[in-house]
Structures are given as structure tokens and as C-alpha cells.
Regions:
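Extended active-site neighborhood of metal-dependent phosphoesterases/phosphodiesterases
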Residues: 1-83, 110-111, 199-201
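Binuclear metal-dependent phosphoesterase catalytic core
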Residues: 26-38, 134, 139-140, 146-155, ...
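Active-site-proximal beta-strand/loop segments in catalytic clefts of secreted hydrolases
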Residues: 44-47, 92-95, 164-167, 183-186, ...
Length: 222
């Protein structure tokens, strides 16, 4: 993180305030005339692994003090905006636990169906776009880590959240009015043959509409 901060156009920092993790920060995008906040961008550290009380091992999550900071800062922005939430997008590595909870068991393998522990799962008609190629890997499922998405719904600002972590998933689903996007891995040393990313276009005149371009290098370069 310190290395990235040395780059001229890096807009992140180690943390906006003292809290768990590294790189938790909020970036505000001004309107074209500079008179108001048009968009808010959240960068959250979803951390890496956790050791559980029962000696198990799993992926970590965004912690309570991080969520508390998000809610405090979100309210500050809303207060500056006449009490209305400033439309926001959010980025973090590990997806929210609710992704798994949206899966439904199906009878057999097929398109956008994945196998896990001998059973088959799909988003069914909840899949808006993209592909489900592997079972999502959210925070440790033996504990309840659903507070973060509930917090977004409570504050009313986050319109879309973007995750990595699952290297070959690139699906889009929506939960409680919030769009959740998985994005392909872009690095060299990872599994799967496809690499990609997303180009996000924000329009200050249409706060509720975000244009997403999904880019897959396998097809862009062929």
C-alpha cells in the first residue's frame, strides 16, 4: 500500500481514520461546476483470513469499526447534501456473505451452475448478467457476517459494489436494490484462462444509473 501511495495518481491512503485494516477511505467526486458532491466512492479493506474460536479457518470480513466509520462518514456527506444520501459505489476484495445466501440448489449441472460439496447451485432468474463459474467465497460462513450490506441499505447511498476474490466469476446480481458485481481476475498468476475488468461511467445527471462496460481480455484481444 505504501508503494502505491508513491504514485502520483493514487487516490487511496492507508486509512482515513484509525480502524481495522488498511486502505479504508472515501473519495468524493464533485459536480462538474464544483458546487456539490456528485458521487462518493468507498474503498474498503475486506482483510484476508480469520482464525475462528473453534479453531477453524476462513476468509475475513469488513469489521464493525470499519462499518461504524462508513456510517459516520456517509451521514456527514448526507448532512452536507441537504439530508439526502450522496450516491455511491464501493470497492473491496472479498464479497459480502449475502451472495451465497442468494444461491439456490438445483438438480443438475448446467450453464451458470456450480458444484459445491456434491450439490449444484445457481442464481436462477436472480442472475442479471455475466456468469457464475465457481462457488463464491465470502467471509467465513459458520458466523454471521451480513452486517455490511445491511449497513449499506440503512444508509441508502451505495448503489453498486464491486468485488474480486473469485477469479473467474463475473456475474451481476441485485440484493435489496444494491447491485453486486463480481469481476474477473486481471493478473498473470491465477487460474482460469480469462482475464478482465470493468469500466464504470458515472453520470452526474442520472445518479441512479451507472453504465458498466465488462471487458474480457480473451475476446478484446482476439
Amino acid at each position: 500500500m505504501i508503494m502505491y501511495n508513491d504514485y502520483q495518481n493514487c487516490r487511496s491512503n492507508l486509512n482515513d481514520e484509525e480502524m481495522y485494516g488498511c486502505g479504508n477511505c472515501n473519495l468524493v467526486v464533485k459536480s462538474s461546476d464544483g458546487t456539490k458532491n456528485a458521487y462518493s466512492i468507498w474503498l474498503m479493506d475486506s482483510n484476508d483470513y480469520m482464525n475462528t474460536p473453534d479453531g477453524d479457518f476462513g476468509y475475513n470480513c469488513v469489521h464493525k469499526d470499519q462499518i461504524d466509520w462508513y456510517e459516520k462518514r456517509s451521514k456527514e456527506l448526507a448532512d452536507e447534501n441537504g439530508g439526502k444520501p450522496v450516491p455511491a459505489i464501493l470497492f473491496q476484495h472479498i464479497p459480502v456473505q449475502q451472495e451465497i445466501l442468494e444461491l439456490q440448489e438445483v438438480a443438475e449441472m448446467g450453464e451458470n451452475v456450480v458444484e459445491h460439496d456434491g450439490k449444484f447451485y445457481s442464481f436462477g432468474d436472480k442472475l442479471i448478467s455475466g456468469r457464475l463459474r465457481e462457488y463464491p467465497c465470502p467471509p467465513y460462513m459458520k458466523q454471521d457476517h451480513t452486517a455490511q450490506l445491511k449497513s449499506w441499505k440503512k444508509m441508502g447511498d451505495v448503489k453498486a459494489a464491486f468485488f474480486g476474490h473469485d477469479h473467474v466469476n463475473d456475474f451481476h446480481i441485485r440484493i435489496d436494490g444494491i447491485s453486486l458485481y463480481q469481476t474477473l481476475g486481471a493478473g498473470y498468476f491465477t487460474y482460469g484462462e480469462e482475464r478482465g475488468g470493468r469500466l464504470i461511467v458515472l453520470d452526474e445527471n442520472t445518479h441512479l444509473h451507472i453504465t458498466i462496460y465488462h471487458l474480457c481480455l480473451k475476446y478484446e484481444m482476439s
